[in-house]
Each structure stands twice: as C-alpha cells, then as structure tokens.
C-alpha cells in the first residue's frame, strides 16, 4: 500500500485531539461512558467544594481539594484525549479518501450501447440503473458493472496500488469503483448505487466512525465496568457514616478521590480508543471493515476457509504436459485442447495455447474467422470449450467431463482414469479434454505452493484455528496439495453450494468461520460466513455480501485480518487485567490515609511508607490520571501479538499485565509521593 501511513503522534493530530478532548467535557459526551461520567461528576463536585472553601462558605483545605479537583479533570481529559486521538487518526484516513471524490460530469447514455446518444450530467445526479460511457482519462463517476468494453483502470486512489488493472464486461472482473481513473480504451457502465451509497462513501462513513456502534464484547465489558462502578460507589457511600460514627468523619473530597481510584478508570478511559484503533489498524492493512463487530469476530474466528489458488499456491497454474488416451495421437489432443482454450483468458487457458504452440507448432487461429461458438466456464458446469464445424470440444474437471460423456452415451476410459490419478498424485491438476463423447486425454496443470505458508498454518494451529483448503480440484490433487501445504482439511471439487453447506456445518458445531471470495457465485457463502473478506477486484454482489473488503484483492490477507482481530481482543483483555490489578496498590495508598485517624490499626496497610495522608491520596489520584496517558500508545498500537494457544496466551498476559498491574502502581505512587514531598505540596 503506497498510501502514506500516519505516525502514532502526528503534531497536527495531537493539536486536533486536544481540542476535541476539551469539547468532549460536556455532560452529553461523558454520559456515553458511565465510568468516566462518575469521574466527571466527581470533578464537578470537588470544583464546587474548592470554590466554596476559597470563598469561606465551608471549612477545609482549598489547596488540597483544588489539586484533587484539577487531577480529576485531567483524568477525564486524558480519557477524552485517547478517544479523540484514535478518532482523529481515523478521520485523517477518511480525509485522504475524500480527496478521491471529485466533482465531475458523466456521459449518461440514452441506450446501453457505447455509440448511443449521450447527455453530459453532473455525476451527483446519476441514479442506480443509469448507463454511462467512460473514456480514457475520465474518472469513473459511480460504482457499477461493466456491460460493454474493456479498459485499463488506475485504482491507486482507492487501493494505494500503482499497477493498473483490467476491467471488462463479463466474468468476475466487471466491477468498477467510483473515483478510479480510466487509463486506456473505454467502458460502458451500469450504475449499481445511488449518490451517497457508493463504496467510497461507505468507506468514508466507516472510517470516520463518529457514531460507531459498540461490539458485543465491548457491551459485555461495559456492563462489567458499570457493575464494578456501582459496587464501589455504594461501598464508598457507606464509609462516611462509619467514619463519622468513629468520631472523625472523612471529607467528601477524600471519598471522591477514593471512589475514582477504586473504579476501573484505566480501561474505562481507553475502551473506546481500543475499538476505534482496531478498525484503523485494519484500514492500515488496506482492509475496509463495515463495522467493529466484523473486526471483533475476526479475533474469535476458529475456522479459516482458504481458496487454494492465490492463497495457498502461487495461482499461476501452467499447462505442463499433454497425456493422450489410448489410441489418440498427442498432437490431436493438443489441437483440441488449444481450440477449446482460444477464448479462455485465464492463465491456465493461455498456457494451454502456448504449450500446444511450443510442442507442435500449432499457431493460434483467428478467433473471428472460425465462426465458432465458445462455451464459457461456469462454477456449475465446471468446464468450457468450443462448438465448431459440427465438433463439440470441451475441457474441464474429471467429474464434469465424466457426466458430459455419459450423458452423451459415451464411456469414460479406464486408462484416462489412471492418467488422471497419476497426475493428481503428483500434486498437479488434471483437466480432461473430450470431443463429443470421445475422451481425448488429460492436460496436466502444475501449481507451486507458496513459500512459508506451511509455517503460517502451523502457527494458526497453535492458536486453535483450523485451516480448510477450498479447491475445484479432484480429491487426489487436493489431498496432495493439502499435505504439502500443511492445512488441516480440504474441500475438493467445491461448488458454491458445497461451500455454503460446509460453512453451515461448522457454524452448527459452534465455530466461527472466515473466508474470502470475489465472484457472484461466492456471495451466498460470504453472506453466511462470520468474517467474509470480499476482494475489491471482485463483483459488486461479492462486495455487498462480505463484511470486509480487501483493497489489495489478496486472498492471503485473511490470515492478517485474523491477527488484527485477535490483537484487538488481546489489547482489550490485557488492559482490563492491568486496570483491575492496579486497583490493589491504590487500596494500600488511600484506605490507610483516609481512615487511619479513625482506625489507627489501618496504618499497618501503609506498606509503601507514604509521607502523609494528603500525599498518599494525591499520589494515588495523580497516578490514576497519568497511567491513562502512558497506556495510550499501547491502546492505539495494540499489545505485542504472538501466535500462541489460548491457555499460553492467558498465562503470558496474566504475568505481564496482571503482575505488571500490581507492581507498577506501587512504584509509581511511591515516586509521586516523594516528588510531592520534595515540592512541599504534601
């Protein structure tokens, strides 16, 4: 991705985040975060108490209460700053996308032909179903499907990838995105959305995320934090009558400070920032998620359905051999295979034409002069071919050709069955060629497993994630490649219906499934999967069915998506552990300071040897505020991610963030206490 990556603390973003943090001090903004709303209410109360003490309306130390009030406001401000900084980074990314949107005119055709009469209209007036003509140098004015023509398109404004891509009518590469530029030739496009509903508009709305909906895990954690806050609020409220009964009532300022230090303000202040940052990191990987729910689901995924071609293998299968049936000349097989592939623009189809040319000097025929009917490949038929001069030539998968032969009254030869098995056992893909009901032989297609993919699958297995390879190959070929790549299972001879059934089967077992897809035939499975990453180069139907879009159109990205999702969940869990653990140190700081005058026995809890009750309370409140600032980089970048099993990950995080949450506050509060004493503020 060539789009500029944002530094963690860009000066411009910092200034904007500080401004937004102050704006978020309003009660309406604070009410959305119940934990921080309690801190905000405490800040208001102590501010009023300070003013009353300064004006002599009530007795008490205005300096002590004022400092407590100031640091409570800082606590709220720092939490606001964390959220504003995360949102600011997302908005900066959105602004870079807004730069792609340009006010332009479009040639709206009166008929769906490139030579039809056209009207120049503003792009904003285009509606779903309108037909437009776009020529070289033009910006595509809307999302849509190419219905005529083919062109080279610069999609760098959307994907960050400088290499142009081909978009043409028919097949899985007919989808175009508004805001991209035509470099050559022309396209006739049927608009698929209304203004404001384009892919670019949805990207911007998602990235800005001003009204981001909370995910299920976030809601559950928020409920837990609210419950803890209510418990500590009730506990704190009961302490005043106890201390008053003992003859030395604790001040309201101290009770507010105690409450703020007891409730989980650290995770409460950072929770929203973690969610926003997770979606921002996903965009940094050039993946657009439609919601935080999709990112969170990626972290919980335990089954990955991976297409073999392009994900597990390099995806450039090349014809390597012609293996004729008994009684058939190899040249005859090569000639028929080349004829069946003349209109096949896939890498496999082109390689068959080239191999026939190299082996037998069979030159490409002029497609137009043949007056032939080409039969395109479909996911249902799983074969393609040509009808020419009363000859019906087909090439395709073994089972598809077998059905074709038997339906035409023929017999599938045993020697071809053996050749198919031999090719498959070597990890190559066998394509069978047939003319009428007469099987001519087998074409071997070789593919190469990507380097390092086996190690990545081993890491996923450690994390408890099952990998399943999806391929249209027969079972023998699929088994050979699956063994070489190290996947846990495979689905051979896959059809759209088989993929959908497999996803439902895993979901019925309580598993969460992730998959990628780019074609219209993938749409049902994408809609069913828990995490569905559609390729940006794919059809509009696929992009609408998925809950994520990969701008790089790289199927391997699914593994990275899962890593980002797990990192977000780990970050949230780690900081929650740290937040709850560091409350323990605050108990040892504040409780002896607040109640030692009433109950001298509590002095035994002052294990840190803090200078005075006032310095102990101030130190705890200041530490409580500062720890939010220190944890902001961790919340935005995410905790260090290592592919481990769930139990190993839990142990690791308990040691680092649980023990760290216990130790760090003891050190921090003691250091702050010493500094306050040296400055004469306690």
Curated annotation (Swiss-Prot):
It is a multi-pass membrane protein. The chain crosses the membrane at residues 34-54, 58-78, 219-239, 254-274, 588-608, 616-636, 662-682. SUPFAM superfamilies: Calcium ATPase, transduction domain A (SSF81653), Calcium ATPase, transmembrane domain M (SSF81665), HAD-like (SSF56784), Metal cation-transporting ATPase, ATP-binding domain N (SSF81660). Its main location: membrane. Part of the high-affinity ATP-driven potassium transport (or Kdp) system, which catalyzes the hydrolysis of ATP coupled with the electrogenic transport of potassium into the cytoplasm. This subunit is responsible for energy coupling to the transport system and for the release of the potassium ions to the cytoplasm. NCBIfam families: ATPase_P-type, kdpB. This is Potassium-transporting ATPase ATP-binding subunit.
């Amino acid at each position: 991705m060539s789009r500029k990556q944002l530094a963690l603390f860009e000066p411009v973003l910092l200034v904007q985040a500080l401004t937004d943090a102050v704006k978020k001090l309003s009660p309406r903004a604070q009410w959305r975060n119940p934990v921080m709303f309690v801190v905000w209410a405490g800040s208001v109360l102590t501010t009023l108490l300070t003013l009353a003490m300064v004006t002599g309306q009530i007795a008490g130390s205005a300096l002590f209460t004022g400092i407590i009030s100031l640091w409570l406001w800082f606590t709220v401000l720092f939490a606001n700053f964390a959220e504003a900084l995360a949102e600011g980074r997302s908005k900066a990314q959105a602004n870079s996308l807004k730069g792609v949107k340009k006010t332009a005119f479009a040639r709206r055709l009166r008929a769906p032909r490139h030579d039809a009469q056209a009207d120049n209209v503003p792009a904003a007036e285009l509606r779903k179903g309108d037909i437009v003509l776009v020529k070289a140098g033009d910006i595509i004015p809307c999302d849509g499907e190419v219905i005529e023509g083919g062109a080279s398109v610069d999609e760098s404004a959307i994907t960050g990838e400088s290499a142009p891509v081909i978009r043409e009518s028919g097949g899985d590469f007919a989808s175009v995105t508004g805001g991209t530029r035509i470099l050559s030739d022309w396209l006739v496009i049927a608009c698929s959305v209304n203004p404001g509903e384009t892919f670019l508009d949805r990207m911007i709305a998602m990235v800005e995320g001003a009204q981001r909906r909370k995910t299920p895990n976030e809601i559950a954690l928020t409920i837990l934090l609210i419950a803890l806050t209510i418990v500590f609020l009730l506990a704190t409220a009961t302490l005043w009558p106890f201390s008053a009964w003992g003859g030395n009532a604790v001040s309201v300022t101290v009770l507010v400070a105690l409450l703020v230090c007891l409730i989980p303000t650290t995770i409460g202040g950072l929770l929203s920032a973690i969610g926003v940052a997770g979606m921002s990191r996903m965009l940094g990987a050039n993946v657009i998620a439609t919601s935080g729910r999709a990112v969170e689901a990626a972290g919980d995924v335990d089954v990955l359905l991976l297409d073999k071609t392009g994900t597990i293998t390099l995806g450039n299968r090349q014809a390597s051999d012609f293996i004729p049936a008994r009684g058939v000349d190899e040249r005859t097989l090569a000639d028929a295979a080349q004829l069946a592939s003349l209109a096949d623009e896939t890498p496999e189809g082109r390689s068959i034409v080239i191999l026939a040319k190299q082996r037998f000097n069979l030159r490409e025929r002029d497609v137009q002069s043949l007056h032939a009917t080409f039969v395109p490949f479909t996911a249902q038929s799983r074969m393609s071919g040509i009808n020419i001069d009363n000859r019906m030539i087909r090439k395709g998968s073994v089972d598809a050709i077998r059905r074709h032969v038997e339906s035409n009254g023929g017999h599938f030869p045993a020697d071809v069955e053996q050749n198919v098995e031999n090719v498959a056992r070597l990890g190559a893909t066998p394509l069978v060629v047939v003319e009428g009901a007469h099987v001519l032989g087998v074409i071997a297609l070789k593919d190469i497993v990507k380097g390092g993919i086996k190690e990545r699958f081993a890491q996923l297995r450690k994390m408890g994630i099952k990998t399943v390879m999806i391929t249209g190959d027969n079972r023998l070929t699929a088994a050979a490649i699956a063994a070489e790549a190290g996947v846990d299972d495979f689905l051979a001879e896959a059809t759209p219906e088989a993929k959908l059934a497999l996803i439902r089967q895993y979901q019925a077992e309580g598993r969460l499934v992730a998959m990628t897809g780019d074609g219209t035939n993938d749409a049902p499975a994408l809609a069913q999967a828990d995490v569905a990453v559609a390729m940006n180069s794919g059809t509009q139907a696929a992009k609408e069915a998925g809950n994520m879009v990969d701008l790089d159109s790289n199927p391997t990205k699914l593994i990275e998506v899962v890593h980002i999702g797990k990192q977000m969940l780990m970050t949230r869990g780690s900081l929650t552990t740290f937040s709850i653990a560091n409350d323990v140190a605050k108990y040892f700081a504040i409780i002896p300071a607040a109640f030692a005058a009433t109950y001298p026995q509590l002095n035994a809890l002052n294990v840190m040897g803090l200078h005075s009750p006032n310095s102990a309370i101030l130190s705890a409140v200041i530490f409580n505020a500062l720890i939010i600032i220190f944890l902001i980089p961790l919340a935005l970048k995410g905790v260090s991610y290592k592919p481990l099993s769930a139990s190993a990950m839990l142990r690791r995080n308990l040691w680092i963030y649980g023990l760290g949450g216990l130790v760090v506050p003891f050190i921090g509060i003691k250091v702050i206490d010493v500094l306050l004493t040296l400055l004469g503020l306690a």
